[in-house]
């Protein structure tokens, strides 16, 4: 069965009672102010059709979803061995901002989707690009077809002000020799990437290359190779949802990436990209109602990579 607006609307009605059972991220003050009753879903098919329900055109802070975009950009700039010499490809089994594992593993982060790994990717981008922040913004605007996407400067400043733990992660990696640039500019770029403001429709369009062998459905142009697409989807399936990746694979069965802003993107290779948003999070930091919505969609349309 193909997704329809009616199916999406029904799913949102079914998950709405979950609102109130999760917790909006409050360690970033600007995120704590987001109304907890927001709920959205958007599907972008490989034929270029948008199907949506709820607050699907409203922008929100994508947070860690941006880590998949930064890694994609790094894969366009570096040979794969240059990236994987500095960051691993394994699930962490620890909190996304853990210092303990990083210390034990000599400053090499487990994967590019935990904070330490994404900070290494930001360092890689800083080494190759004269203006990495602007380049990432242009990249996202191009892939989404939305020239109005911006960084939320209030969120970025809020993250920088409350980002001591991320600074500790960066300095710890530098002490192990796994850092090339000055820490503060790299962190500023990292925080800005997390502060990208996008809607579910924007996100579904932006990530369409992951469902289409590396070619953006929105632009018709290649972003990465089919092999790199397979690699990105594999990492998303195993590491994309913090310490809840196994649970997500079990329930939803699609490669995905979440953010503490309450967004999740999910990929059905060869068919479609999906984005959901509900700000309340579960214990792993993933959208509570958003995960349930994806689980229901997977069941209704009979799609899973497993």
UniProtKB/Swiss-Prot annotation:
Documented EC number(s): 3.5.1.2
Cite the entry's keywords alphabetically.
Hydrolase
Query: What domain of life does the UniProt record list for this protein's source?
Result: Bacteria
Q: List this protein's GO terms for biological process.
A: glutamate biosynthetic process; glutamine catabolic process
HAMAP family with a match to the protein in the record: Glutaminase
Instruction: Name the family the entry cites.
Output: Belongs to the glutaminase family.
| Protein name (database record) | Glutaminase
Organism, scientific name: Vibrio parahaemolyticus serotype O3:K6 (strain RIMD 2210633)
